[in-house]
Regions:
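Catalytic alpha/large subunits of respiratory electron-transfer oxidoreductases
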Residues: 1-258
């Protein structure tokens, strides 16, 4: 034990299968867990999920970089619109993304929208070069993103004369973002990878959802991997009392399928 050996596929598969059966017999299926890549195909995710659940385990997850799992049982998170619809947006607020690096193809579509007059806005740790004109950019350390987004929500509430979801201070930049979103016709609030991986991701999600609702915008998730949405469709994450990725990595299972 403790050493890597190069073997043929049959030997490797039998070794893994026997190991999983042993853990199931000694600790029930709950002793098993699976950390699956969100880049995997739908078939791979579905088969792995089916295997674990038939062995009695709900310890399955693809959210390997997430830190906040408190709202994991919500609706499927996706872009919220067809990809082609990005070209037709006239207002876009991106939260927590180096758009040009993280999502170059989506960035190109938003860039096309900007060329046709769309106002692009961002909340990030720093002002990134997205190779497109920016209407407004709010920079804050990641630990302050919840306060910053709450400020944008408060600015929206102030413009509309309604109660904000939480009381928060806001400045001119937040006011510019709020007014732009309220005046647009086709608009979106998009959460990037850094927002989804944030330690207060659920709070950012709730605030973004409120802003989108009150401004008539579509809420979307840019998505970190090729099959993030597919993983949700086949329930490759805990649906009952299973452990999430962070809990499994803390050593709460006896064996992990990677």
């Amino acid at each position: 034990g403790g050493e890597w050996h190069e073997v043929d596929w049959q030997t490797a598969l039998e070794y893994v299968a026997n190991g999983m059966k042993h853990i199931q017999e000694e600790h029930t299926g709950r002793g098993l867990g699976a950390l699956l890549s969100p880049h995997s195909t739908l078939e791979e995710l579905a088969l792995a999920t089916r295997l674990l659940r038939q062995m009695g385990s709900d310890n399955i997850d693809t959210r390997l970089r997430c830190a906040d799992f408190s709202d994991q049982h919500g609706k499927i998170r996706w872009l919220g619109m067809p990809i082609a619809a990005l070209n037709g947006l006239d207002r876009v607020l991106v939260v927590g993304s180096h758009l040009r690096k993280d999502h170059p193809l989506l960035a190109q579509r938003i860039r096309q929208a900007a060329r046709h007059g769309a106002q692009i806005m961002a909340l990030n740790e720093e002002r990134f070069d997205w190779a497109m004109p920016m209407h407004a950019s709010l920079e804050a350390p990641a630990v302050q993103w919840t306060l910053a987004l709450a400020g944008i929500a408060a600015a929206v509430a102030s413009e509309r004369g309604i109660q904000p979801p939480v009381e928060a201070e806001f400045g001119l930049e937040a006011t510019d973002i709020a007014r732009a979103l309220l005046n647009g016709a086709n608009k979106a609030v998009l959460l990037g990878n850094a927002a989804v991986h944030h330690e207060q991701a659920s709070a950012l999600h709730a605030l973004a959802q409120w802003i989108a609702k009150e401004t008539g915008a579509t809420l979307g998730f840019l998505g970190e991997a090729a099959n993030t949405v597919g993983a949700q469709l086949v329930r490759a994450q805990p649906v009952a009392d299973g452990l999430n990725a962070a809990e499994m990595l803390q050593g709460k299972v006896k064996g992990l399928l990677l």
